[in-house]
Amino acid sequence: SHDIRIPLVSATGSTRMGKAVGAAVGRRLGRSLLELGGNNAIIISAEADLDMALIGAAFGAVGTAGQRCTSTRRLIIQEKVYNKFKEKLVNAYKQLKIGDPLNIKNHVGPLIDKDAVKMYLEAIEKCKAEGGKFIVEGGVLKGKGFESGCYVQPCIAEAKNSYGIVQHDTFAPILYLMKYKTID
């Protein structure tokens, strides 16, 4: 971002990262294109193919342990299919295999470090404090294969889009479910 030979810096990530990139590029009067703090969503309509939506939602939320800037963090589900989809999603989460990411039988690997684990746990507590209801509980996994302390349980919370934590990027496998009546 400091190199004047680079005419445009494009980055996707947290608001914090964007401020750092923006400041560095701004010092050289360069241009930047930033996509920040979006907490990607999937909107599931009453007409959606729920099995297809389930595959996309589950992979988007837990792939790379939710540590991509493009990870799915919110599911906005039409109320007529909300309970049916929620049941399918909870069942899918019960079948997730967590462990060494080099083992192709595993779906979810570790968070990058203990700081990421701390932010994951803080996000869970913030969601609960704002009124979120966890339908799949999170937590740090213990036991054989999890000695690093960086393996966590992907979790699902019923939440409201107005919650502060829902508007804040958490690079971890936390998925927020929200119900809608009409798209408007």
Where are these regions (language model features)?
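Cytochrome P450 core scaffold surrounding the K-helix E-X-X-R motif
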Residues: 163-167
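Histidine (H) residue identity feature
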Residues: 2, 103-107, 168
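A structural signal for short secondary-structure junctions
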Residues: 69, 169-170
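ALDH superfamily catalytic-core signature
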Residues: 8, 14-161, 179-184
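A structured beta-alpha segment of the ubiquitous adenosine-cofactor-binding alpha/beta core
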Residues: 1-10
